[in-house]
Design a protein with these regions (language model features):
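Alpha-helical transmembrane segments and their membrane-interface boundaries
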Residues: 83-341, 345-358, 363-365, 373-421
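Soluble N-terminal domains of membrane-associated systems
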Residues: 1-110, 117-119
Length: 421
């Protein structure tokens, strides 16, 4: 997504209020939470000498007002484009805010130039995106308990889904149509590979491949917005995630209906291992898949080890609790608490937003896949199985919301262990 920054000749007429507004726009269009946008803009305004600053942010809109350095009251209103998750830009703007706090006397033209650089920065090349799809699809398939042959088939499908996503993003500007076509490719490749004898369970192959399309960050951010009482923005994000899951279901169902050798998906999707070797493999693959998926969210590479470790740890805890209790709430609550608490520690230590860690490493626990399966089975007329997955989706959502809310009650001072040098 491209943001229209002022031309060089126009920057001279812009002041500190415009710079703060532009930063808010970058954050909004990068998928930042409402409170994150308001907090960052407030810190930047304070650093730039804007007094009595106030801001109101809603989905696709930013409004600010304050007293400039001349003591004059100014207000700004700006409509933003549809947000897309780009945690790298979010982290860069956060760094710029800290830089302004340390060096407040920077010219406005310099701030605009830095924001423009952030917007134009290329974090990953198309080949890296495709590689992430391959590793993510194969890893998550194995993390869910599939066999090595099914994981390999999911990785092969991930190649074509990744290529398709690159092509669709260039020529198709409707997001839900991109998702429908990408999920159709996943179903096509999974059934072809299964037909050729590459793979044992087509449902697991499709599921592993579709993990790279599941809108995990939208669900996590929506839950965080609800816990902050930002119901309008939370609902908008949740609907974005729901529409993506609906698009995935339509794409898979349409392709399966077309192919003469395809069959409807079964209710068996994953088999959590009970052996230590199996649990170890699933844990490692969950961490690898989390790190690979972070590429699609444009997370800087320096955080991959943190994210992979956290993703693996949360999935290990989930498997241990589930294998010993078979209690859904406990199996999600404690891993979610691990992710939220660790994310806050890492945010202070790494000096970056907790969203960078929370949105990515929470991915193995997110309820998006359950919602996709619920919609799919409801569409094919299997109401019992559809309602069962729908129940699991809402249960996971509210459990994660409880974990996030509990962690937010802890004062920030308890998470300060030291600063990274």
């Amino acid at each position: 997504m491209t943001i229209d920054f002022p031309r060089e000749t126009e920057i001279e007429t812009k002041n500190e209020m415009d710079a703060v507004l532009q930063a808010g726009r970058v954050l909004m269009e990068s998928g930042a939470e409402i409170y994150r946008i308001e907090d960052t803009m407030g810190h930047m305004a304070k650093s730039l000498g804007i007094r009595d600053f106030s801001t109101y942010v809603v989905n696709r809109g930013v409004m600010i007002s304050g007293l400039n350095r001349s003591g004059l009251k100014e207000s700004r209103v700006l409509a933003t484009s549809v947000p897309s998750i780009h945690l790298g830009k979010l982290e860069e703007v956060n760094r710029l805010s800290r830089e302004l706090a340390e060096q407040p006397n920077q010219p406005v033209s310099s701030i605009f130039q830095k924001l423009k650089t952030i917007e134009q920065k290329t974090f990953y090349r198309p080949l890296e995106d495709i590689t992430a799809c391959v590793i993510g699809a194969g890893s998550f398939s194995l993390a869910l308990g599939s066999s090595w042959i099914d994981g390999t088939a999911a990785a092969i499908s991930g190649v074509f889904v990744g290529i398709g996503m690159q092509l669709f993003s260039r020529f198709i500007h409707t997001s839900f149509l991109q998702i429908i076509l990408s999920s159709a490719i996943a179903a096509l490749l999974a059934n072809i590979l299964y037909y050729l004898g590459i793979g044992q369970h087509r449902s697991v192959i499709i599921l592993g491949t579709l993990m790279i399309l599941i809108p995990g960050a939208y669900f996590v951010n929506a839950i965080r917005e609800f816990t902050q009482n930002n119901y309008y923005s939370g609902l908008a994000l949740m609907l974005s995630g729901v529409s993506t899951c609906l698009s995935i279901s339509v794409g898979v169902l349409a392709m399966i209906s077309i192919l003469p050798f395809a069959e409807q998906l079964s209710g068996m999707f994953s088999t959590p291992s009970t052996s230590w070797l199996g649990v170890s493999i699933q844990t490692f693959m969950a961490g690898l898949g989390t790190a690979a998926f972070s590429v699609l969210y444009r997370v800087p590479k320096k955080y991959f080890l943190d994210l992979g470790t956290l993703g693996a740890g949360s999935w290990l805890l989930y498997l241990l609790i589930w294998n010993n209790t078979h209690h859904e709430v406990l199996a999600i609550l404690f891993p979610a608490l691990l992710v939220t608490i660790t994310s806050r520690f890492l945010a202070h230590y790494r000096r970056c937003p907790a969203t960078v860690f929370l949105a990515s490493s929470m991915f193995p626990l997110i309820p998006g896949m359950s919602f996709y399966r619920a919609v799919y089975f409801l569409l094919i007329g299997n109401a019992d199985l559809g309602l069962s997955f729908l129940r699991a989706c809402f249960l996971a959502s509210f459990t994660i919301a409880i974990a996030v809310s509990l962690t937010q009650q802890i004062p920030s001072r308890y998470f300060v262990l030291g600063k990274k040098k």
